[in-house]
Amino acid sequence: MVDLIVGLQWGDEGKGKIVDLVAKNYDIVIRSQGGHNAGHTVVVDGKKYALHLLPSGVLNPNATNVIGNGVVVYPKQLIKEIRSFEHNIKEKLLISDKAHMILDHHIAIDQAREKLRGKNAIGTTGRGIGPAYADKIARVGVRMGELRNIPKLIEKLVHYYEMNKGYFDYLGIEIPSISKLEEELKEYKQELGSLITNTTQYLWDNMDKNMLLEGAQATLLDIDHGTYPYVTSSNTIASGALTGSGIAPKNLNKVIGIAKAYATRVGNGPFPTEDDGKAGDKIREQGGEYGTTTGRPRRCGWFDVVAARYAVTLNGCDEVAVMKLDVLDGFDKVKVCVGYEIDGEKIDYFPSELDDVKPVYVELDGWDGSVHVTKWEDLPKNAQKYIEFIEEKIGTKIKYVSTGAERNATVIR
C-alpha cells in the first residue's frame, strides 16, 4: 500500500509535520524529487530538526528511508544531515543509484545565472537544482551509482568541463582541479557508497509493506503546472512522485494534500492573495515565516480557494491537512479568496498567467484560542466555520488541522 503526501501551495506548508505524524504507520518513507532547496522542519519532544534531503521518516526508528531516482542529491549536504543525528541513521537509509548528483559547478552556475538575470531574477535558492536537472535532461548528468567507478567518472567530468569551458569562462566559474575532484568524489563514496542501490527494485520487492511517498516543494511550483517560470525544476505533483520513485499508479492508495490556513511564497513570482500590509506582517511574525533553507522572510497572504481547488484536482487528493491554523488567532476578520478578476471579468479557475489577476475575497469572523487544541469540538466555533468553509469550497475532506508546531498539536477529524 502506497500513500502520498503533497503540498498544495508554494511550499513550506508543513508537510514534514504530517509525515512525522503518520510515519509511524509506514514501513518505508520515500523522497521522490527535488533537492536540498527543499527545507522542512520537524519538532519532536521540543527538539527541532531541519531536513533538506533526508525523508522525514528518519525520525521514526522503525522506518526505512529512501531517496528516490527523481531526487538531485548534493552529497555534501546529505553527509552533513546524516552527521547531525546523534544516532546512526545509515542503517535505515537507501539512495537510488539513478538519482542525479549536484556538484559544486551546478551551484556556481545557478548563482551566476541568477545574478546575470538582474531584475528578471527568478528567486532561485542558488542550490544548483536547475542546472543539475538541466544536465539530466541533456543526458550529461552524473548519477549516484557512478561513484562505484571513480576513475571512469573523473574521465567523464573532465570531458564535460572541456565541452563547457567557454560557458564556464563566460560565467566566471573556475573549473576544479582533478586532484580536488578526486578527493571529493572519494569522500562521497566513502560516506554514501554503502547506501547506494537500486531503490526501484527494493520498492517493488516490498510492495506488501506500507509506504509513504513524501513530496518536496509543492503543486504551484511544478515545472509544468505551476506559475512558470517562477517554479522549481521538477514535477512536484502526485504523478511526479511516482516517476521519481518507480512506483506504478495502480499501487497508489491515497493522496493527502497539505495546505496552510493562509498562504506564503518565497522568492519572486505572482501571488494573488499576498498582503504586504499589517495583516501580512502579523501572519509572518506569528507564523515564523522565514525560509528553512535560505532564512529569507516569506511573502504572506490569505488562503486562496481557487489555487487550492486546482491543486487538489491536479493531485487527485483524497483528504487534506490544513496547517498552522493557530497563526490566525487574534484576527478580527480573516479573508478567503473565492475567485479571481481579470480585466473586469470574474473567473473561478486557475489560469496559466497570474500577473493581472486580482483576488475576490469573502470575509469571515476571526477567533482566539486554537493553539494546541487536539479535539475538533474544542476549537473556537469561528475556527470550525473557517475550516468547514474551505472544505466546502475545495470539495475534499479536511482530515487534519494543525494547531501548533508539536506533533501532537493536531486535530484529526
Curated annotation (Swiss-Prot):
Give one Pfam family, short name only: Adenylsucc_synt
Q: Sorted alphabetically, which CDD domains does this protein's record hold?
A: AdSS (cd03108)
Matches recorded under InterPro entries: Adenylosuccin_syn_GTP-bd (IPR018220), Adenylosuccin_syn_Lys_AS (IPR033128), Adenylosuccinate_synth_dom1 (IPR042109), Adenylosuccinate_synth_dom2 (IPR042110), Adenylosuccinate_synth_dom3 (IPR042111), Adenylosuccinate_synthetase (IPR001114), P-loop_NTPase (IPR027417)
PANTHER family of this UniProt entry? Answer: ADENYLOSUCCINATE SYNTHETASE (PTHR11846:SF0)
Q: Name one GO molecular function term.
A: GTP binding
Where substrate binds, per the record, is at: 292-298
Q: Which residues bind GTP?
A: 11-17, 39-41, 298, 324-326, 402-404
Query: Which positions bind Mg(2+)?
Result: 12, 39
Keywords of the record, alphabetical order, are: Cytoplasm, GTP-binding, Ligase, Magnesium, Metal-binding, Nucleotide-binding, Purine biosynthesis
Record's protein name: Adenylosuccinate synthetase
Parts of the chain that traverse the membrane = none
